[in-house]
């Protein structure tokens, strides 16, 4: 894209998830919780894939989802269900030695 604002935003987004005082893994969990509270299914999927790539365990995933549920309330339950399905699908892909999407 020739749009400088979009390019700058994409660069900022990439840099926000780089290793720093917080690990990439923690930042992806934060992104996942935020995306769940905001009810953005595409964003949830994106962060789940990155969480799995970063080695997030089931225990870590469900603990993060508990935070999302408290912050977002019961309205996020449909998104939470999809997130659990997607997380389990991604874990299965890894277990089967297959590549994760994106």
Name what the model sees in each region:
Residues 40, 71-78:
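Amphipathic C-terminal alpha-helical segment
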Residues 46-61, 87:
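Iron-sulfur (Fe-S) cluster-binding segments and ferredoxin-like electron-carrier domains
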Residues 24, 42, 59-62:
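Short, solvent-exposed positions on alpha-helices
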Residues 1-26, 76-102:
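Acidic, glycine/proline-rich low-complexity segments that act as flexible tails and inter-domain linkers
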Residues 26-35, 64-73:
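Alpha-helical scaffold segments that form or flank carboxylate-/histidine-based iron centers
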